[in-house]
Amino acid sequence: MAGNRYFEDQPYEVENPFNIMITLSPFDIDLSTTIMMPKTLLEANLFRFMDISYLVGLLQVPNKPKVIELFDIDTKITTFLTIRRDGDNFKFHGWNNILERKHYKAGDVIAFWWDLHHTRLNFKHVA
């Protein structure tokens, strides 16, 4: 959902210390259905903002993925992905649905940040 009558979409802020900056690897864009993010990065920059029951389910039930909402701040398109722990990383399954609309290359930098008002993960191509 793009905005609502109470809160605008939270824009990308360069100076936000909780931005999750991911440099895309060839694996992330070449026929991949997932994008991987390190657990330590998500612990520091994302988990603190999530609902505790969601987070407990994600961390304590390893074989049960959780659905997460990703919102493209530029196109205002929402995509639902599943997130699952994989060792010391988390994989976001369904990434290929975003790749179908975007023309990312290896080396592109994507910023992800939690939108507190809409309880979703926003993202933007920044470099």
Curated annotation (Swiss-Prot):
Q: Where is it located? A: Nucleus
Its taxonomic path starts at: Eukaryota, Viridiplantae, Streptophyta, Embryophyta, Tracheophyta
Against Gene3D superfamilies, the record matches this protein to: DNA-binding pseudobarrel domain (2.40.330.10)
Annotated DNA-binding ranges come to 35-127
GO MF entries: DNA binding
Its name, as the record gives it, is: Putative B3 domain-containing protein At4g12617
Write the record's keywords in alphabetical order, separated by commas. DNA-binding, Nucleus, Transcription, Transcription regulation
Q: Which InterPro entries match?
A: B3_domain, DNA-bd_pseudobarrel_sf
Listed under GO cellular component are: nucleus
